Amino acid sequence: MSHATFANRKSKTIIMKKLSFLLLSFCTILCMYGQKAHELQSPDGNLRIVINLSDKIQYDVMYRNDILLQQCALRLEVGNQQLGSNPKLTKVSRKSINESLTPVIPLKYSIVSNTYNQLLLKFKGDYSIEFRAFNDGVAYRFITDKKGIIDVNSETLQLNFPENYLLHVQQPGGFKTAYEEEYRHIQSNEWKTSDPMILLPVLIDTRKEYKILISESDLTDYPALFFKSNGNNSMSSIFPKVPLEFGEDGDRSLKIEKEASYIARTNGKRSFPWRYFVISTNDEQLIENTMTYQLAQKNVLKDTSWIKPGLASWEWWNGATPYGADVDFVAGCN
Protein backbone atom coordinates (compact mmCIF):
# COMPACT_ATOMS: atom_id res chain seq x y z
CA MET A 1 0.00 0.00 0.00
CA SER A 2 1.41 3.38 -0.99
CA HIS A 3 1.86 6.20 1.48
CA ALA A 4 -0.73 8.29 -0.42
CA THR A 5 -3.37 5.54 -0.27
CA PHE A 6 -2.83 5.05 3.46
CA ALA A 7 -3.08 8.80 4.04
CA ASN A 8 -6.34 8.98 2.07
CA ARG A 9 -7.89 6.14 4.05
CA LYS A 10 -6.80 7.71 7.32
CA SER A 11 -8.26 11.05 6.23
CA LYS A 12 -11.59 9.41 5.33
CA THR A 13 -11.70 7.65 8.71
CA ILE A 14 -11.15 10.93 10.52
CA ILE A 15 -13.87 12.63 8.46
CA MET A 16 -16.34 9.80 9.18
CA LYS A 17 -15.61 10.03 12.91
CA LYS A 18 -16.19 13.78 12.83
CA LEU A 19 -19.44 13.35 10.92
CA SER A 20 -20.60 10.69 13.39
CA PHE A 21 -19.74 13.00 16.28
CA LEU A 22 -21.64 15.89 14.68
CA LEU A 23 -24.65 13.67 14.00
CA LEU A 24 -24.64 12.38 17.57
CA SER A 25 -24.36 15.94 18.91
CA PHE A 26 -27.24 17.05 16.69
CA CYS A 27 -29.44 14.19 17.91
CA THR A 28 -28.51 15.00 21.51
CA ILE A 29 -29.51 18.63 20.99
CA LEU A 30 -32.81 17.54 19.47
CA CYS A 31 -33.50 15.27 22.44
CA MET A 32 -32.58 18.03 24.87
CA TYR A 33 -34.91 20.42 23.05
CA GLY A 34 -37.68 17.84 23.12
CA GLN A 35 -37.21 17.37 26.87
CA LYS A 36 -36.81 21.07 27.65
CA ALA A 37 -38.64 22.47 30.65
CA HIS A 38 -40.85 25.48 29.99
CA GLU A 39 -41.57 27.72 32.95
CA LEU A 40 -44.42 30.18 33.38
CA GLN A 41 -44.56 32.62 36.29
CA SER A 42 -47.39 34.66 37.73
CA PRO A 43 -47.14 38.46 37.27
CA ASP A 44 -45.95 38.87 40.89
CA GLY A 45 -43.39 36.06 40.47
CA ASN A 46 -44.65 33.92 43.36
CA LEU A 47 -46.47 31.18 41.44
CA ARG A 48 -44.75 28.98 38.88
CA ILE A 49 -45.83 26.16 36.65
CA VAL A 50 -42.98 24.14 35.14
CA ILE A 51 -43.88 22.00 32.10
CA ASN A 52 -41.60 19.10 31.18
CA LEU A 53 -41.73 17.47 27.75
CA SER A 54 -40.41 13.94 27.25
CA ASP A 55 -42.44 10.94 26.10
CA LYS A 56 -45.35 12.68 27.84
CA ILE A 57 -46.29 16.09 29.18
CA GLN A 58 -45.93 16.67 32.91
CA TYR A 59 -45.98 19.77 35.05
CA ASP A 60 -45.18 20.95 38.57
CA VAL A 61 -47.04 23.73 40.38
CA MET A 62 -44.88 25.73 42.79
CA TYR A 63 -45.33 28.68 45.13
CA ARG A 64 -41.93 30.28 45.48
CA ASN A 65 -39.75 27.24 46.30
CA ASP A 66 -42.52 24.99 47.62
CA ILE A 67 -43.76 22.21 45.31
CA LEU A 68 -47.54 21.92 45.71
CA LEU A 69 -48.31 19.49 42.86
CA GLN A 70 -45.62 17.39 41.21
CA GLN A 71 -45.20 15.50 37.93
CA CYS A 72 -48.85 15.92 37.04
CA ALA A 73 -49.74 14.37 33.70
CA LEU A 74 -52.17 15.58 31.05
CA ARG A 75 -53.40 13.94 27.86
CA LEU A 76 -56.38 14.04 25.50
CA GLU A 77 -57.39 10.99 23.44
CA VAL A 78 -59.06 12.04 20.19
CA GLY A 79 -60.04 9.17 17.91
CA ASN A 80 -56.92 7.01 17.64
CA GLN A 81 -54.58 9.87 18.53
CA GLN A 82 -53.10 10.45 21.99
CA LEU A 83 -52.56 14.19 22.30
CA GLY A 84 -49.78 14.59 24.84
CA SER A 85 -48.02 11.26 24.23
CA ASN A 86 -44.59 11.60 22.59
CA PRO A 87 -45.22 15.32 22.00
CA LYS A 88 -43.40 17.06 19.15
CA LEU A 89 -43.14 20.74 19.98
CA THR A 90 -43.32 23.03 16.94
CA LYS A 91 -43.85 26.51 18.39
CA VAL A 92 -43.69 28.40 21.70
CA SER A 93 -45.38 31.75 22.22
CA ARG A 94 -45.83 33.95 25.26
CA LYS A 95 -47.81 37.04 26.13
CA SER A 96 -48.94 39.06 29.14
CA ILE A 97 -52.44 40.43 29.69
CA ASN A 98 -53.54 43.21 32.04
CA GLU A 99 -57.19 44.08 31.52
CA SER A 100 -60.42 44.79 33.36
CA LEU A 101 -63.58 42.74 32.84
CA THR A 102 -67.08 44.07 33.46
CA PRO A 103 -69.65 41.39 34.36
CA VAL A 104 -73.17 41.83 33.00
CA ILE A 105 -74.47 40.97 36.47
CA PRO A 106 -71.89 41.67 39.18
CA LEU A 107 -71.66 38.82 41.68
CA LYS A 108 -68.60 39.73 43.74
CA TYR A 109 -67.22 42.74 41.89
CA SER A 110 -68.51 45.21 39.30
CA ILE A 111 -65.04 45.25 37.72
CA VAL A 112 -62.78 42.18 37.69
CA SER A 113 -59.03 42.55 37.25
CA ASN A 114 -57.75 39.99 34.74
CA THR A 115 -53.96 39.97 34.87
CA TYR A 116 -51.91 36.95 33.83
CA ASN A 117 -48.97 35.59 31.87
CA GLN A 118 -49.66 33.07 29.12
CA LEU A 119 -47.65 30.28 27.54
CA LEU A 120 -48.91 28.56 24.39
CA LEU A 121 -47.21 25.32 23.33
CA LYS A 122 -48.07 24.15 19.82
CA PHE A 123 -47.45 20.51 18.88
CA LYS A 124 -47.32 18.39 15.78
CA GLY A 125 -50.71 16.74 15.32
CA ASP A 126 -52.88 19.87 15.16
CA TYR A 127 -53.14 20.62 18.85
CA SER A 128 -51.88 23.10 21.41
CA ILE A 129 -51.90 23.47 25.18
CA GLU A 130 -52.42 26.90 26.69
CA PHE A 131 -51.19 27.70 30.19
CA ARG A 132 -52.01 30.81 32.22
CA ALA A 133 -50.46 31.98 35.47
CA PHE A 134 -52.35 34.46 37.64
CA ASN A 135 -51.25 35.87 40.99
CA ASP A 136 -53.83 33.61 42.67
CA GLY A 137 -53.67 30.48 40.53
CA VAL A 138 -52.75 28.62 37.36
CA ALA A 139 -54.81 27.06 34.59
CA TYR A 140 -54.44 25.11 31.35
CA ARG A 141 -56.56 23.85 28.48
CA PHE A 142 -56.23 21.84 25.27
CA ILE A 143 -56.89 23.45 21.88
CA THR A 144 -57.42 21.38 18.73
CA ASP A 145 -57.32 22.46 15.10
CA LYS A 146 -58.78 19.42 13.37
CA LYS A 147 -61.22 19.12 10.49
CA GLY A 148 -64.84 18.11 10.94
CA ILE A 149 -66.30 16.37 13.97
CA ILE A 150 -64.09 14.49 16.43
CA ASP A 151 -64.73 11.90 19.14
CA VAL A 152 -62.98 12.53 22.44
CA ASN A 153 -62.50 9.12 24.05
CA SER A 154 -60.90 10.32 27.28
CA GLU A 155 -59.01 13.12 28.96
CA THR A 156 -56.28 12.45 31.49
CA LEU A 157 -55.65 14.86 34.34
CA GLN A 158 -53.46 13.15 36.91
CA LEU A 159 -52.56 15.07 40.07
CA ASN A 160 -49.77 13.88 42.35
CA PHE A 161 -49.38 15.18 45.89
CA PRO A 162 -45.83 15.46 47.28
CA GLU A 163 -47.11 14.93 50.85
CA ASN A 164 -50.22 13.78 52.69
CA TYR A 165 -52.87 16.42 52.01
CA LEU A 166 -56.32 16.87 53.52
CA LEU A 167 -59.06 16.79 50.86
CA HIS A 168 -62.44 18.45 51.44
CA VAL A 169 -64.72 16.73 48.93
CA GLN A 170 -68.19 15.54 47.96
CA GLN A 171 -68.51 11.87 47.00
CA PRO A 172 -71.53 11.02 44.85
CA GLY A 173 -72.59 7.44 44.27
CA GLY A 174 -72.30 7.93 40.51
CA PHE A 175 -72.30 10.48 37.73
CA LYS A 176 -75.99 11.19 38.30
CA THR A 177 -75.81 13.70 41.14
CA ALA A 178 -77.56 16.84 42.38
CA TYR A 179 -74.27 18.07 43.88
CA GLU A 180 -75.90 18.01 47.32
CA GLU A 181 -73.77 15.37 49.04
CA GLU A 182 -72.27 16.34 52.37
CA TYR A 183 -68.60 17.25 52.41
CA ARG A 184 -66.15 14.67 53.70
CA HIS A 185 -62.58 15.16 54.84
CA ILE A 186 -60.14 12.61 53.44
CA GLN A 187 -56.44 12.01 53.97
CA SER A 188 -54.96 11.88 50.47
CA ASN A 189 -52.67 8.95 51.32
CA GLU A 190 -55.62 6.96 52.73
CA TRP A 191 -57.96 7.46 49.76
CA LYS A 192 -58.29 4.06 48.09
CA THR A 193 -59.06 3.17 44.49
CA SER A 194 -62.17 1.34 45.72
CA ASP A 195 -63.52 4.48 47.42
CA PRO A 196 -66.18 6.62 45.73
CA MET A 197 -65.16 9.25 43.22
CA ILE A 198 -65.32 12.97 43.97
CA LEU A 199 -66.81 15.92 42.13
CA LEU A 200 -65.78 19.54 41.67
CA PRO A 201 -64.86 21.80 43.29
CA VAL A 202 -62.16 20.15 45.39
CA LEU A 203 -60.53 22.02 48.25
CA ILE A 204 -57.10 20.77 49.33
CA ASP A 205 -55.34 21.71 52.54
CA THR A 206 -51.60 21.15 52.17
CA ARG A 207 -51.24 21.37 55.97
CA LYS A 208 -48.73 24.15 55.53
CA GLU A 209 -49.63 27.70 54.54
CA TYR A 210 -51.38 26.84 51.28
CA LYS A 211 -54.80 25.70 50.17
CA ILE A 212 -55.58 24.60 46.62
CA LEU A 213 -59.02 24.94 45.05
CA ILE A 214 -59.50 22.80 41.92
CA SER A 215 -62.30 23.39 39.44
CA GLU A 216 -63.05 24.02 35.76
CA SER A 217 -64.47 26.72 33.50
CA ASP A 218 -65.80 27.25 29.97
CA LEU A 219 -67.64 23.94 29.75
CA THR A 220 -69.28 23.73 26.31
CA ASP A 221 -70.32 20.54 24.55
CA TYR A 222 -68.32 18.53 27.09
CA PRO A 223 -68.98 16.51 30.27
CA ALA A 224 -68.20 17.58 33.83
CA LEU A 225 -64.94 16.48 35.44
CA PHE A 226 -64.81 14.00 38.34
CA PHE A 227 -61.82 12.41 40.09
CA LYS A 228 -60.95 8.90 41.29
CA SER A 229 -58.12 7.87 43.58
CA ASN A 230 -55.06 6.21 42.08
CA GLY A 231 -54.25 4.70 45.47
CA ASN A 232 -50.76 6.21 45.68
CA ASN A 233 -51.39 9.71 47.02
CA SER A 234 -52.65 10.88 43.66
CA MET A 235 -55.90 11.14 41.72
CA SER A 236 -56.97 11.03 38.08
CA SER A 237 -59.83 12.38 36.05
CA ILE A 238 -62.91 10.36 35.18
CA PHE A 239 -65.78 11.41 32.92
CA PRO A 240 -69.28 10.17 32.11
CA LYS A 241 -69.68 8.92 28.55
CA VAL A 242 -72.17 10.33 26.07
CA PRO A 243 -75.66 8.85 26.67
CA LEU A 244 -77.31 7.34 23.61
CA GLU A 245 -80.59 5.90 24.90
CA PHE A 246 -82.80 6.91 27.83
CA GLY A 247 -85.54 5.36 29.92
CA GLU A 248 -88.05 6.72 32.43
CA ASP A 249 -86.77 7.40 35.94
CA GLY A 250 -89.25 9.40 38.00
CA ASP A 251 -90.94 12.68 37.21
CA ARG A 252 -87.85 14.85 36.81
CA SER A 253 -85.04 12.70 35.47
CA LEU A 254 -84.15 10.08 32.89
CA LYS A 255 -82.27 6.81 33.21
CA ILE A 256 -79.35 6.21 30.86
CA GLU A 257 -79.77 2.81 29.21
CA LYS A 258 -76.99 2.96 26.63
CA GLU A 259 -73.72 4.86 26.48
CA ALA A 260 -71.27 5.66 23.71
CA SER A 261 -67.60 4.70 23.86
CA TYR A 262 -66.59 8.39 23.88
CA ILE A 263 -67.08 11.24 26.36
CA ALA A 264 -67.73 13.92 23.72
CA ARG A 265 -68.51 14.22 20.01
CA THR A 266 -67.66 17.77 19.11
CA ASN A 267 -66.15 20.23 16.65
CA GLY A 268 -62.52 19.54 15.79
CA LYS A 269 -61.61 23.24 15.83
CA ARG A 270 -62.18 24.30 19.41
CA SER A 271 -60.77 25.02 22.84
CA PHE A 272 -61.56 22.58 25.63
CA PRO A 273 -62.53 23.37 29.24
CA TRP A 274 -60.06 25.10 31.49
CA ARG A 275 -58.65 23.11 34.42
CA TYR A 276 -57.66 25.58 37.09
CA PHE A 277 -55.97 25.65 40.49
CA VAL A 278 -56.51 28.56 42.87
CA ILE A 279 -53.54 28.78 45.25
CA SER A 280 -54.26 30.64 48.48
CA THR A 281 -52.14 31.59 51.45
CA ASN A 282 -55.22 32.67 53.42
CA ASP A 283 -58.88 31.68 53.26
CA GLU A 284 -59.98 35.16 52.15
CA GLN A 285 -58.38 34.54 48.77
CA LEU A 286 -60.59 31.50 48.20
CA ILE A 287 -63.73 33.60 48.66
CA GLU A 288 -62.41 36.54 46.67
CA ASN A 289 -61.22 34.55 43.64
CA THR A 290 -63.05 35.01 40.33
CA MET A 291 -61.18 32.38 38.33
CA THR A 292 -64.29 30.75 36.86
CA TYR A 293 -65.46 34.07 35.45
CA GLN A 294 -62.01 35.11 34.24
CA LEU A 295 -61.60 31.87 32.26
CA ALA A 296 -65.17 31.69 30.97
CA GLN A 297 -66.05 32.44 27.37
CA LYS A 298 -66.58 36.14 26.72
CA ASN A 299 -70.15 37.38 26.52
CA VAL A 300 -71.52 37.13 22.96
CA LEU A 301 -74.82 38.96 23.56
CA LYS A 302 -74.86 42.43 22.03
CA ASP A 303 -77.85 43.59 24.07
CA THR A 304 -77.83 42.71 27.77
CA SER A 305 -80.12 45.49 28.99
CA TRP A 306 -82.98 43.03 29.51
CA ILE A 307 -81.02 40.96 32.04
CA LYS A 308 -81.93 42.05 35.56
CA PRO A 309 -80.95 40.45 38.87
CA GLY A 310 -83.81 39.52 41.17
CA LEU A 311 -85.31 36.99 43.54
CA ALA A 312 -86.42 33.48 42.64
CA SER A 313 -88.77 31.13 44.47
CA TRP A 314 -89.21 27.40 44.10
CA GLU A 315 -92.30 26.27 45.96
CA TRP A 316 -91.05 22.70 46.40
CA TRP A 317 -87.96 24.01 48.15
CA ASN A 318 -89.45 26.64 50.43
CA GLY A 319 -92.70 24.77 51.22
CA ALA A 320 -95.16 27.27 49.75
CA THR A 321 -97.11 24.37 48.12
CA PRO A 322 -99.65 26.43 46.14
CA TYR A 323 -101.75 23.40 45.18
CA GLY A 324 -105.22 22.06 45.99
CA ALA A 325 -108.88 23.13 45.94
CA ASP A 326 -108.37 25.80 48.61
CA VAL A 327 -105.81 27.71 46.56
CA ASP A 328 -107.29 30.51 44.45
CA PHE A 329 -103.91 31.80 43.21
CA VAL A 330 -104.41 35.40 44.27
CA ALA A 331 -101.37 37.63 44.28
CA GLY A 332 -98.82 36.71 46.91
CA CYS A 333 -97.56 33.53 48.48
CA ASN A 334 -100.47 31.14 49.01
What feature does the model see in each segment?
Residues 3-5, 20, 27, 53, ...:
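Generic detection of intrinsically disordered/low-complexity segments and helix-coil linkers/edges
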Residues 1-37:
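Bacterial Sec-dependent N-terminal signal peptides
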Residues 267-333:
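An acidic-aromatic substrate-binding cleft motif
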Residues 39-292, 299:
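N-terminal accessory beta-strand-rich subdomains and adjacent acidic, glycine-rich linkers
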Residues 8, 13, 43, 142, ...:
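Generic detector of bulky aromatic hydrophobic side chains
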